[in-house]
Design a protein with these regions (language model features):
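Asp-box/BNR beta-propeller blade signature and adjacent active/binding-site loops
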Residues: 1-118
Length: 118
């Protein structure tokens, strides 16, 4: 068994990530953007994950009030379009993080989009 040493792919507070092999063979990474502007972004690797096109990121959503969002998962439909689902919490947060989420403030959202790297 062999594996390479881990390398940093995203910047600080850009997590968690989800990987998908696209129909084109490229690898898509979607991740939560937990810095302003809060949302979900995507980038691609054309060389089996050896390098990532950090300069051509796609902003899929920028609708968060704060960094409590993310865990995106993406699938590619048979027509080639992409569907990314993620969660987002709106409203004020307890700075100590101990009061939890107010009912009605957490949502699951879906973004349908075209593969811009085709």
């Amino acid at each position: 068994m062999h594996w390479d040493a881990p390398v940093t792919v995203t910047r600080e507070r850009e997590h968690p990530g989800d990987l998908l092999r696209l129909q084109s063979g490229a690898i898509l990474l979607t991740f939560g953007q937990r810095n302003k502007p809060f949302g979900v972004q995507a980038m691609i690797s054309l060389d089996e994950g050896k390098s990532w096109d950090r300069h051509r990121r796609v902003v899929l959503a920028w609708d968060g009030d704060h960094g409590d969002l993310g865990y995106p998962v993406t699938v590619q439909r048979s027509d080639g379009r992409l569907a990314t689902i993620y969660y987002v919490v709106y409203g004020e947060r307890d700075p100590e993080g101990i009061k939890g989420i107010a009912p009605g403030n957490a949502f699951t959202k879906l973004v349908l989009w075209d593969d811009p790297w085709k």
